[in-house]
Amino acid sequence: MAKKGNDRADADSPWKMILRQYFQQAIEFFFPDIANKIDWNIPVAFLDREFQQLTPDSEVGKRFADQLVRVYQKGGNSIILLIHLEVQAEPEDIFPERIFTYLLRIFDYFHQPPISLVILCDNDPEWRPDRYGFTTFGSSLQFNFTTVKLLDYAERWEELEVSQNVFATVVMTHLKAQEMKRNVTRRKEWKLR
């Protein structure tokens, strides 16, 4: 069981590094409609310290893939953008609830609603969480969040090969790693291509 946690921490670390380095390209690649509404002339602010205070349970070993970023809309309004990367290999039943909990904590702290974006990196084509809700004695709540599934990019391989966005290469590498998980020799050959 501890092995899974270490695998997850190891997988999260490269994601966090590349997200920080190429944040704009990530949003442009995975969430182009949102990218078009952001004023990229104003520097983004990574709110790591604030996010750690809000979500002390988000640290598991070296796991820090969750990103809380302040960006500005075209026109000057500040928005909080929550990027949550789901890089674990197994679907997790409480994942939508966790995204909702993050939303509540961020809203409570900043007094403005965040945008929750999720990149699903697992290999289960059926697992596609995008909402959390409940109804109890006449009270109800429905929270929807935006997701992309890396598996879906497998059908767009030719498009990825010609893309100039660094995340096209990241996605191709991720998909090939999943495809060749048990074939180390083939994986090494593909990486050296």
Where are these regions (language model features)?
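Conserved single-residue anchors adjacent to enzymatic active/cofactor-binding motifs
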Residues: M1-R193
